[in-house]
């Protein structure tokens, strides 16, 4: 029962975390070409989403993931798909902090023009890493069992 609750919490938090990361990149790129005051508002909104949505859900996803490993008494380490998923989770975690640094830079500058090209690349990287992580769980788990 505990494992089921942790799994549901993990999936929900991942959806909200990844969705918020993509939303941040969309907010920043939406401000490109606008007046400086409008760009400053877009940058502030992106920072607010990062602080109030993305970071808390990242923490919940991380804690529920470690909770699942602990509740299963390390069983996941025997499965090859878990190692791929864990590696991709670390990549997404790193992208989270890179995205946060870019958002802070945009807010400090009061403009989104300078970080918009990086945001497009970060958006693609987050989506690809998330899709590959889902592929590790669904495809490899189905093929190899567990």
Summary of predicted features, one role per range:
Residues 1-146:
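Polytopic transmembrane helical bundles with strong interfacial aromatic enrichment
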């Amino acid at each position: 029962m505990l494992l089921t609750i942790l799994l549901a919490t993990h999936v929900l938090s991942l959806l909200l975390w990844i969705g918020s990361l993509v939303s941040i990149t969309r907010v920043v790129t939406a401000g490109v070409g606008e007046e400086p005051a409008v760009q400053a508002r877009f940058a502030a909104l992106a920072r607010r989403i990062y602080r109030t949505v993305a970071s808390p859900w990242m923490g919940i996803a991380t804690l529920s993931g470690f909770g699942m490993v602990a509740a299963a008494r390390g069983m996941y380490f025997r499965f090859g798909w878990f190692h791929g998923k864990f590696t991709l989770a670390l990549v997404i975690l790193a992208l989270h902090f890179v995205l946060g640094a870019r958002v802070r830079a945009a807010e400090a500058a009061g403009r989104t023009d300078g970080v918009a090209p990086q945001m497009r690349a970060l958006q693609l990287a987050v989506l690809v890493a998330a899709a590959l992580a889902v592929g590790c769980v669904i495809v490899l788990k189905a093929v190899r069992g567990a």
